A protein has these predicted regions:
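Short acidic active-site motifs
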Residues: 54, 126-130, 159
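A conserved helix-loop-beta module that forms one wall/lid of the active-site cleft
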Residues: 84-150
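Short catalytic-loop micro-motif centered on adjacent basic/acidic residues
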Residues: 4-5, 66-69, 119, 153, ...
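ATP-binding N-terminal substructure of ATP-dependent carboxylate-amine bond-forming enzymes
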Residues: 1-96
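Glycine-rich phosphate-binding loop signature in dinucleotide/nucleotide-binding domains
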Residues: 58-64, 132-134, 170
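Short acidic-hydrophobic, aromatic-tinged amphipathic segments that line or gate anion-handling sites
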Residues: 44-50, 120-125, 152-155
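Phosphate-binding site of ATP-dependent enzymes
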Residues: 157-195
Length: 195
């Protein structure tokens, strides 16, 4: 059995180790030749991991049985799309990957299904009249980044403006979400998939 792992950061290091313990051959793709997980897989490709055609070609050439990543929701889009294109098994469909990796889509699904969520605005540009409808502190996020990249808590208008501009640069689509801060406990869950 052969697995393609996309992205070579700290979370993927453990994934690669787990796959190797299960005697699964591993192929790692990452845009950084010196990524942290570089030494672990059986084979490594330096490639733009968001280029669907390049990822697909490597998956076909390597005859992988499945494609996987962890802790990277934007990369999950690539995993799901290429898996669907090639008819490979995947733990998430492309539409579901879109729903969880786009914060605006996710918020809309929450509202449609009456799942409590914070008050928010989707902003194409910085509109202080719209923002005045929300209560500080505010959380500013790129709509489509991952690993808390660009997520900042703004206590003042000055911080909000700076964080908005930062989030807009980080967002691949240029979209930014601003939402009211909610004090609470964050819970993370790690699972092992049975292969």
């Amino acid at each position: 059995m052969k697995a393609m792992v996309i992205a070579g950061g700290v979370p993927q290091m453990e994934l690669l180790r787990q796959l190797k313990e299960r005697k699964i051959e591993t192929v790692l793709l990452d845009g950084n030749e010196n990524c942290l997980a570089r030494a672990i897989p059986d084979k490594f490709y330096k490639v733009n991991i968001f280029n669907i055609e390049d990822v697909k070609k490597i998956a076909v050439d390597e005859k992988v049985d499945f494609i996987i990543t962890v802790c990277a929701d934007q990369v999950l889009l690539v995993v799901a799309e290429v898996s669907e294109m090639l008819g490979l098994p995947c733990y998430i469909g492309y539409k579901q990957a879109q729903d969880v990796s786009d914060k605006i889509r996710m918020k809309k699904i929450f509202k449609e299904n009456k799942i409590p969520t914070t008050k928010y605005l989707e902003l194409e540009s910085l509109d202080m009249n719209e923002i005045a409808k929300l209560n500080y502190p505010l959380v500013v996020k790129p709509v489509d980044a991952y690993s808390s990249k660009g997520v900042r808590k703004a206590e003042t208008e000055k911080e909000l403006i700076a964080y908005y501009n930062e989030a807009k640069k980080i967002s691949r689509s240029g979209g930014v979400i601003v939402e009211e801060f909610f004090e609470g406990e964050e819970i993370s869950l790690t699972t092992n998939l049975p292969f």
